[in-house]
A protein has these predicted regions:
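A short hydrophobic/small-residue beta-strand
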Residues: 7, 165, 232-233
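Short aromatic/hydrophobic contact patches that present stacked aromatics
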Residues: 39-41, 119, 207
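Conserved SAM/SAH cofactor-binding pocket of Class I
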Residues: 118-202
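Surface-exposed loop/turn positions
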Residues: 93-95, 142, 230
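Short beta-strand micro-motifs in enzyme catalytic cores
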Residues: 38-40, 110, 265-267
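S-adenosylmethionine
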Residues: 171-271
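A short, charged helix-loop
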Residues: 110-116
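N-terminal auxiliary segments of SAM/dcSAM-dependent transferases
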Residues: 2-106
Length: 272
């Protein structure tokens, strides 16, 4: 960016191959590093001197021999283009995620109105889908906690599915802002808090769709937040991580057989 780029991103050059490296980070806790082989994409002014930029980059980084390609990006209606990439998502025939610019496919369903935005959770990711499908199967929900609420999608779904009282917490202040905005758009009354201000009450259901590393550390907190006989649902877990998570939570929960979707896992259980 210091060399004049309008925007820049770094991606794993081995993404979607066997050599792909999974690196995650949380707000305030950045990932430990970047990948061994990277693709850097920069957006530049149309008249930018790419050769001079690469020369400066080599001087700054002491790395030489960059291979590169350029592409001219034509002016478009970027809002319309972005909107065209998001369609209503069917979780079950009776539960849909619908962007604001779309009509709900069926008015008889529970429709969660949600646009892509500041925080994770639009319904398209397998972990979100797993949690939403599980929530839709719960016959009775009184008090529900969404720990690591992101966009608030799980909390909003719980409320629309009939939960009496729903609370959401997140470490990221932007997620709390996004959740409150989305709840207002869906006309549901939900309390969202920064996790530092969260009062550790007990709930009938605790759902957490966050990174597995965070789930490992937060196991005592999540267990304390769930009443005896209550249920937990955890996701954000890769299939290779499910045994370690199940073992960690078995101290407090009778853990069910994991549910797997596209390499991601939903771990559920009942509080002992």
């Amino acid at each position: 960016m210091a060399l004049g780029a309008l925007s820049a991103s770094i991606e794993d050059a081995n993404a979607e191959t066997q050599a792909e490296q999974a690196i995650f980070g949380e707000p305030g806790d950045p990932p430990p590093g970047i990948w061994h082989h990277n693709v850097v994409t920069a957006m530049l002014e149309a008249n930018a001197d790419v050769v001079q930029l690469l020369t400066s980059l080599e001087q700054e980084t002491k790395i030489t021999g960059f291979s590169y390609s350029t592409e001219i990006i034509e002016e478009q209606d970027w809002v319309r283009l972005t909107q065209s990439q998001f369609e209503p998502i069917e979780i079950t025939p009776k539960l849909w995620i619908v962007p604001t610019w779309h009509e709900a496919p069926t008015q008889d369903a529970i429709n969660i109105i949600l646009d892509p935005g500041l925080a994770f959770g639009t319904g398209s990711h397998p972990t979100t889908h797993l949690c939403l499908a599980w929530l839709s199967q719960q016959s009775a929900m009184h008090r529900v906690l969404d720990y690591g609420c992101g966009s608030g999608i799980l909390a909003i779904a719980a409320k629309k599915l009939g939960a009496t009282e729903v609370t959401g917490v997140d470490i990221d202040p932007q997620a709390v802002i996004a959740s409150r905005y989305n709840a207002e758009n869906n006309q549901v009354d939900i309390q969202f808090y920064d996790s530092n201000a969260y009062l550790h009450e007990t709930y009938d259901i605790v759902v957490a769709n966050i990174l597995s590393s965070a789930l490992m550390v937060l196991a005592p907190v999540i267990a304390k937040s769930c009443k005896t006989g209550g249920k937990m649902a955890l996701s954000g877990i890769l299939e290779t991580q499910k045994e370690a998570l199940a073992q960690q939570y078995s101290e407090w929960f009778d853990v069910d057989t994991p549910v797997v979707k596209d390499g991601w896992v939903l771990l559920t259980g009942t509080k002992k």
